[in-house]
Swiss-Prot record:
Family of the protein in this entry: Belongs to the ZraP family.
Top-level taxon of the source organism: Bacteria
Protein name listed in UniProt: Signaling pathway modulator ZraP
Gene (name only): zraP
Keyword terms: Periplasm, Signal, Stress response, Zinc
A cellular component annotation (GO) from this entry: periplasmic space
Cleavable signal peptide: 1-26
Subunit structure: Forms oligomers. Stabilization of high-order structures requires zinc.
Amino acid sequence: MKRNNKSAIALIALSLLALSSGAAFAGHHWGNNDGMWQQGGSPLTTEQQATAQKIYDDYYTQTSALRQQLISKRYEYNALLTASSPDTAKINAVAKEMESLGQKLDEQRVKRDVAMAQAGIPRGAGMGYGGCGGYGGGYHRGGGHMGMGNW
């Protein structure tokens, strides 16, 4: 009797695995559109791609120091939180510094987005959601897709 139960459970498990794995092989994975990052709409021309790449490269160059500062503050914040006796005043001060750095990055992101719009590059085109930009590569207050994570 036990052997039949084990066989039945194994058969059910294999069946469920086979049925659920079909989604992994179906079409465009999570909207990736065969490697094109643009979310719908018509593909970018070669000129638009070059323009978008330059805008993003400039953005990353201009925000590199800010992003590094934010990462350092994030480590400092986490270290303060894990101290044997956390100092609330220091934690609040570092949190305010992180917020200020985040606002500066937001301002740069807006400038980048305006430059993209002025270049005629539709929203959602180029480097994917959020352009991998922002706080440590993807933190955009409620989303993003990669990066150092949220504080």
